[in-house]
């Protein structure tokens, strides 16, 4: 741990098209090599695809997807007397959001469609229907926490 003071949280500006801060965080995570305009193009084109498929507001779909992906508990390693236990702990709201965003992006990148916008749109549609790799990741995390419930008294 650093002995200095904690870094200040910077305010994320809302995106230009939808005026949403969470969407900006998503784009920032999607961005590679500082190419924000490329990330924006991918997201907006994916949103257009989602809107044409589901006939719903893409921003609503996006937030519903994140809600379906957000984990409520996770396991953390805790060393007690030479043994390492996987201790289930509740996830803070900021971390929930960050994990959901990260899992959605990783699941999208792992898909087999041709372009990133197709992959992202496909994963968004799957996540809103509670399918897909990102939702599976959350289910696996919850299963791990449930399996290690016996060690929950080691919480810190």
Swiss-Prot record:
Q: Name one Pfam family in it.
A: Ribosomal_S7
* One GO CC term, this protein: small ribosomal subunit
Keywords from the named record: Ribonucleoprotein, Ribosomal protein, RNA-binding, rRNA-binding, tRNA-binding
Output the SUPFAM superfamilies linked to this UniProt entry: Ribosomal protein S7 (SSF47973)
Molecular function terms from GO: rRNA binding; structural constituent of ribosome; tRNA binding
Domain of life the protein comes from: Bacteria
One GO term (biological process): translation
Matching PROSITE patterns = RIBOSOMAL_S7
Per its database record, what is this protein's job?
Answer: One of the primary rRNA binding proteins, it binds directly to 16S rRNA where it nucleates assembly of the head domain of the 30S subunit. Is located at the subunit interface close to the decoding center, probably blocks exit of the E-site tRNA.
Indicate the quaternary assembly. Answer: Part of the 30S ribosomal subunit. Contacts proteins S9 and S11.
Protein family per UniProt: Belongs to the universal ribosomal protein uS7 family.
Q: What is this protein called?
A: Small ribosomal subunit protein uS7
Name the gene for this chain. rpsG
